[in-house]
A protein has these predicted regions:
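The C-terminal output helix
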Residues: 147-157
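Single conserved hydrophobic/aromatic residue that forms the stacking wall/gate
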Residues: 175-184
């Protein structure tokens, strides 16, 4: 239990570091950095997307309803039919946007990323993707984003399994709240 509290504290430290980075970038651009999370999948994906958006908003990103955002995350599913096809189709479109805006960052997560053949395809065919992570470590989004900012290369962090559940991190209730938006 103590280890999980320490991990939660560690992730908040990464959020604070990234908050400074986002603020600096926003000042350089003269506008807030924007983000968009696209969810392909089941209710678990929706819940995970709420957590991802909560972390992004905590570090200073502003959610927009378009995929032409500064940071775009695709949260994927292997259970829902056609999720793979949808993702690869969207990545084809996003590649053009990234060519126009090389500063744009693209993250892929979810259970589809747990499959080794998918990771290999992305590494070889979609080299413009910045961050790839699975279902077990979405709580590390700020840490992975920092690693990407520091390295300038693709970050891949897939955990095969874990008993680690990190709670007490921000979430933005989009799907499970009766009100249109509840971020905390």
């Amino acid at each position: 239990m103590e280890q999980l509290k320490n991990e939660s504290s560690r992730q908040y430290e990464y959020m604070e570091e990234m908050k400074k980075w986002v603020q600096k970038k926003s000042e350089e651009l003269g506008r807030k950095l924007t983000c968009h999370v696209t969810t392909f999948g089941c209710q678990m994906n929706e819940k995970d997307s709420e957590k991802l958006l909560g972390i992004l908003e905590t570090i200073g990103y502003e959610e927009v309803e378009t995929e032409d955002a500064d940071f775009l995350i695709f949260n994927t599913c292997t259970v829902r039919e056609n999720a793979n096809t949808k993702l690869y189709g969207h990545l084809g479109q996003v590649k053009k946007m990234k060519e126009r805006n090389p500063q744009m960052m693209i993250g892929l997560c979810g259970c589809m990323m747990q499959e080794e053949h998918v990771i290999e395809k992305i590494r070889t065919s979609y080299k413009f993707v910045d961050i790839i992570f699975g279902t077990h470590n979405i709580f590390k989004l700020a840490e992975l984003l920092k690693a990407r900012v520091d390295s300038k290369g693709m970050i891949v962090d897939i955990w095969k399994n874990t008993d680690q559940i990190v709670e007490d991190l921000p979430s933005c209730l989009l799907y499970t709240s009766p009100s249109p938006r509840d971020c905390s």
